[in-house]
Amino acid sequence: MKRTVSIVGAGRVGRTLGRRLHDLGWRILAVVTRSSAKSREAVRVIGAGTPMRLGRSAGLHFRERKTGSMRALALNLDKVFAAEVIFFTTADDVLPSLAGAFARLAGDRSRGRIVLHTSATLDRVALAPFARYGAAVGSMHPMQAFGGSVMPNLKNVIFAVEGDPRAVRMAESIAKSLGGIPVPIATRDKTLYHAAAVMAAGSLYATIEAGLQLLERAGFTRRRAGQTLFPLVRQIFDNIERIGPRAAWTGPLSRGDYEILARHARALRTGVPEIRKAYAALAMLAASLVSANPHEVKKRTAQALDV
């Protein structure tokens, strides 16, 4: 018998999970989004499911934390909760309020179900209203970038899982079936886990953009700037993965060439001030975390950069 799943909030993460599960033979029952057009598009991408939208309802609403606006809930809850597993893949700002509204409306239809969300920062508490009606709740977050138009492969991706025992077992099973690697995480550590991802990967968007802009100031076209930096960045990632950050560390600071740092600082005095500040902050961070002699390297780096 095929396993069944409903998906609430079919953005990039929801569509990816839905498509991958559909490919594995899961029955996709309901796909719920803010609008009919978005839900139909999500069903088209996933390849299965009944499109549903959040609409007007008699007295049941949830509040979006980011905007403070109220939205109404009206849909076929029998269809949604006919599934064994219900995924909430919505944005963090709306998840607790939306889950509460769903749980109140679904009532005992939640009993025996497994309700999971994919937030990197929120934990099972966001789904606590379902637990009060007898559902097992938890979270499973894939450490993967979902930007762009290409649906990411989840093979070998780490899934951080936490929650009630039955929810964790299901999350681990789903992660493994997707080719991923489930890793248990303590509820209290989820925010730190997400901060690690943003520090290691999310900040790259800004640092690489800064590098591209500096090359444009040096006379490169945008295309040529990308051709110059991207192979370098890819090679650095390969080296870090292979031998670790400390062994892979390269550049003037790793060689103790403080005169080069001083020249960089002078060159960066014109242009975007935030780039110079970021350069100095990242150099000091490298001196603290990667160098073999942090105290001395930090001191000389600060002198070279005049910070």
Where are these regions (language model features)?
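Rossmann-like NAD(P)(H) cofactor-binding subdomain of soluble oxidoreductases
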Residues: 36, 69-150
